[in-house]
C-alpha cells in the first residue's frame, strides 16, 4: 500500500469512534505488512541462525551433555531467536523509516499514535511465529529430545515477543540517530550471546553477574519459555513474568514520552 491510498483511507473515517480505531488499525497493519515483506525472510533467517544455530554450536563445545543440559539448550533457543527480532530488527526498521522519510509521514497521519505502535508490535509478533517454530523444530531434531509443552507456552511467547519488540521500539524512538541505534543493538547482541544465562543455568555465573541479570530481561525470557516447554528446570516463574511485564511497560513509556514531546 502506497502513501497516498493509506492517507486517504485513514482520512475517510474519524479515529475517535471505536469502528474508526479498528479500521485505522487494520489499514496500518496492512501497510506495515506490505512495506516490510522484503524483511520477512531476513528476520526469519536471523531468528533461526541465532536460535537453533547457537543451540547447535553450544552442543559442539560441550558434546557430552546430560539430558537436563540438552533441555536447557533446546528450551533456551526460542529466547535467543526472539531477542534479535525485537531488539535489532525493530530498531533497524525504524531507522530505515527515518532515512526514507516514511517515519515522518506516519507521524503526520490523522491516526492515534497508539494505533501505529499496536500495528508495529502486531507485525513483530506475527513475524516471530515461523522463526520460533523452525528454531524449536531444528533444535529438538538435532538433540532428539521431547518437550513437555504446556498451555503456558502461549502467554510465555506472547509476552517475551511483546517485551523484546517494545524495548526495541522504545530504543528506536529515544535515539534518533540510526547509526547510534545500530551500534547499540550490535553491542547488545554481543552481550546477550556471551554474558546472558539463557542456554545454561544462571548459577554458573559469578554472583555479581547473576545478580545483574535479576533486573535484566534476557534471563527471565528464558525462564518463562523454559517453564512452558519443560518440567522441573525452572522455579519462581511468577517473578520472571513480573520483570518482563515491567520491561514491556518501560518500552511503552519510552515511546509515549517521545510522542508527547513531539506532539
Predicted regions located by residue number:
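Hydrophobic alpha-helical transmembrane segments of multi-pass membrane transport/permease proteins
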Residues: 38-64, 71-87, 188-193, 246-247
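Hydrophobic alpha-helical transmembrane segments of multi-pass membrane transport proteins
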Residues: 50-53, 57, 70-142
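Junction motif at the cytosolic side of a transmembrane helix
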Residues: 2-12, 58-61, 141, 229-232, ...
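Aromatic- and glycine-rich beta-strand/loop motifs that create alpha-glucan
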Residues: 2-50
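Membrane-interfacial helix-loop-helix junctions in multi-pass membrane proteins
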Residues: 146, 194-250, 262
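Hydrophobic/aromatic residues in alpha-helical transmembrane segments
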Residues: 53-58, 83-90, 134, 166-167, ...
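Alpha-helical transmembrane segments and their short interhelical loops
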Residues: 113-114, 118-185, 233-245, 250-252
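Transmembrane helix segments
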Residues: 58, 62-64, 174-215, 219
Amino acid at each position: 500500500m502506497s502513501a497516498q491510498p493509506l492517507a486517504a483511507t485513514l482520512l475517510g473515517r474519524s479515529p475517535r469512534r471505536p469502528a474508526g480505531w479498528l479500521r485505522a488499525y487494520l489499514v496500518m497493519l496492512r501497510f506495515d505488512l506490505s512495506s516490510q515483506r522484503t524483511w520477512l525472510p531476513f528476520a526469519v533467517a536471523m531468528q533461526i541462525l541465532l536460535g537453533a544455530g547457537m543451540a547447535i554450536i553450544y552442543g559442539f563445545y560441550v558434546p557430552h551433555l546430560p539430558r537436563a543440559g540438552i533441555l536447557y539448550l533446546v528450551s533456551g533457543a526460542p529466547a535467543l531467536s526472539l531477542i534479535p527480532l525485537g531488539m535489532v530488527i525493530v530498531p533497524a526498521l525504524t531507522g530505515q523509516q527515518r532515512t526514507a522519510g516514511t517515519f515522518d509521514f506516519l507521524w503526520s497521519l490523522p491516526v492515534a499514535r497508539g494505533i501505529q505502535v499496536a500495528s508495529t508490535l502486531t507485525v513483530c509478533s506475527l513475524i516471530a511465529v515461523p522463526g520460533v517454530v523452525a528454531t524449536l523444530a531444528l533444535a529438538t531434531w538435532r538433540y532428539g529430545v521431547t518437550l513437555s509443552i504446556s498451555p503456558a507456552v502461549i502467554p510465555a511467547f506472547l509476552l517475551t515477543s511483546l517485551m523484546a519488540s517494545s524495548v526495541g521500539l522504545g530504543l528506536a524512538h529515544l535515539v534518533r540517530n540510526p547509526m547510534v541505534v545500530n551500534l547499540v543493538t550490535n553491542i547488545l547482541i554481543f552481550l546477550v550471546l556471551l554474558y546472558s544465562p539463557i542456554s545454561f543455568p544462571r548459577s554458573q555465573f559469578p554472583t555479581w553477574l547473576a545478580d545483574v541479570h535479576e533486573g535484566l530481561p534476557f534471563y527471565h525470557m528464558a525462564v518463562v519459555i523454559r517453564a512452558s516447554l519443560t518440567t522441573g528446570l525452572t522455579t519462581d516463574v511468577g517473578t520472571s513474568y513480573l520483570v518482563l511485564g515491567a520491561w514491556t511497560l518501560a518500552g511503552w513509556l519510552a515511546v509515549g514520552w517521545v510522542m508527547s514531546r513531539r506532539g
